[in-house]
Amino acid sequence: MVAEDAPVRGTCRVLFRTTTLIFLCTLLALSISILYESLIIRKQIMSQAGSTGSNFRLGSITDLLNNILSVANQIIYNSAVALPLQLDTLESTLLTAIKSLQTSDKLEQNCSWGAALINDNRYINGINQFYFSIAEGRNLTLGPLLNIPSFIPTATTPEGCTRIPSFSLTKTHWCYTHNVILNGCQDHVSSNQFVSMGIIEPTSAGFPSFRTLKTLYLSDGVNRKSCSISTVPGGCMMYCFVSTQPERDDYLSTAPPEQRIIIMYYNDTIVERIINPPGVLDVWATLNPGTGSGVYYLGWVLFPTYGGVIKDTSLWNNQANKYFIPQMVAALCSQNQATQVQNAKSSYYSSWFGNRMIQSGILACPLQQDLTNECLILPFSNDQVLMGAEGRLYMYGDSVYYYQRSNSWWPMTMLYKVTITFTNGQPSAISAQNVPTQQVPRPGTGDCSATNRCPGFCLKGVYADAWLLTNPSSTSTFGSEATFTGSYLNAATQRINPTMYIANNTQIISSQQFGSSGQEAAYGHTTCFRDTGSVMVYCIYIIELSSSLLGQFQIVPFIRQVTLS
């Protein structure tokens, strides 16, 4: 219930602060008016009968203004500091009470199931935040791997395949999904989808474990692909597309594949809808979920998306001649400026994919069951992001961030802060601000390898998102110093050597490779959270590892502690 009231609480905060600002502006105007009138009166009195009486009147007015300003300062403090803290404390208290009630001895004695979909009290206030200051970020190290039971099932035959994990975590619970193919990993005709939800609990050793409370296996003949998942109040929401042909054929077509939203609640209610967002048909040749997780934001569920835009459509024309070159390129690329600009502009268009413009964006859906025409597509401006690719959305406090897979020519981790504009209660536009970094590279072939630093056309890379440990907005220049953690494939051209790391804008601070040299791997997802009891920060690194026994890949969750050295 608390999670469901989050949008209302956020709206009340905005209304309260807006009213406060209007009140303060009125007070300021009145104060200026009173001061102006008092000066005129003072002049008149001094010219007529001296200044004794006017000084008394002016002193009275000054005292009145001081009282007004004192009240105004108290209002500012209450609205900006005290009220948000009280709301956070109240939320934590309510969640703790609900957790305690649903696991009480009385319920257990009455044979009631005591498992609530709420994380342990130690973690509720330690989720979706920045965990270290800028100074602390310079001295972080990775702890050893912690042994926990895996909440991710693997293939059970040598021919089976589990791929494309997506994981989402909020204060209350987590949601997870991956694709299951019965024979090999290359299949655009038939697959199933595994979904689970659960909570974080402490082990007797003191570190966290992930307890699964509900699972769902979608095996109904619908070939859902590239699914992106998000936690929502009381359950999970998932965005998938239905694949019926190879990826290249999707881009060459003129109508996008079927788009689906699935809502799964903890009480076993399942709602699935085929969605038709306005502005997609006849504009997008194909539209795919970003595979990385989405977020629940102000009553809307936001998912990363990307696809191919048809030539001469309104979106195509609006993005014409737009390009983005990351800040770090200037000092690292030997091309002259004109060549960089020309190559950067052409990098958004793929001849392999029928000369479509490869575009990134956000799918925004209200949290309701009738979603057929309610979801919206919000494209990023291509002078703020690179060529369209898989991605992930994050919540850090009240801020939304975006990871974009480095499919294009710049091989480094691409993170952005996202601003969402609302019009008449609906998200209407998005903008992105890049966190400048020259770490951490992904592998690629030819001119698109991990060593490339100059603009050009690339369609390479691998999904490897990262978690920000420090706030990029904490520096005078946005993102000039930021620390983040994740996993990457430590090779220039091959998908090998999975390595967990902590890095900043310019260097890798700490790293640990998993397995022997040459170990094959693929996608990597990273999420961090804090145990507010011990104040320790943990990160879960979900990595696709190649397997010679069961399936081509096994999806494995690794947990490490991030510590100050």
Curated annotation (Swiss-Prot):
Region of interest (Involved in neuraminidase activity), residue spans: 223-228
Pfam families, alphabetized: HN
EC code: 3.2.1.18
EC main group: hydrolase
Sugar-bearing residue positions: N110, N139, N267, N504
One GO cellular component term: virion membrane
UniProt topology in membrane: Single-pass type II membrane protein
Segments on the Intravirion face: 1-20
Keywords assigned by UniProt, alphabetized: Disulfide bond, Glycoprotein, Hemagglutinin, Host cell membrane, Host membrane, Host-virus interaction, Hydrolase, Membrane, Signal-anchor, Transmembrane, Transmembrane helix, Viral attachment to host cell, Viral envelope protein, Virion, Virus entry into host cell
Localization per record: Virion membrane; Host cell membrane
Transmembrane segments: 21-41
Major site of localization recorded for this protein: virion
A GO MF label: exo-alpha-sialidase activity
GO terms, biological process: symbiont entry into host cell; virion attachment to host cell
CDD domains linked to this entry: HN
Disulfide bonds: C161-C185, C175-C236, C227-C240, C333-C454, C365-C375, C448-C458, C528-C539
Catalyzed reaction equations: Hydrolysis of alpha-(2->3)-, alpha-(2->6)-, alpha-(2->8)- glycosidic linkages of terminal sialic acid residues in oligosaccharides, glycoproteins, glycolipids, colominic acid and synthetic substrates
Residues exposed to the Virion surface side: 42-565
Family membership: Belongs to the paramyxoviruses hemagglutinin-neuraminidase family.
Purpose: Attaches the virus to sialic acid-containing cell receptors and thereby initiating infection. Binding of HN protein to the receptor induces a conformational change that allows the F protein to trigger virion/cell membranes fusion.
Domain notes: The C-terminus (head domain) is involved in binding the cellular receptor.
Name assigned to this protein: Hemagglutinin-neuraminidase
Species for this entry: Parainfluenza virus 5 (isolate Canine/CPI+)
Gene field: HN
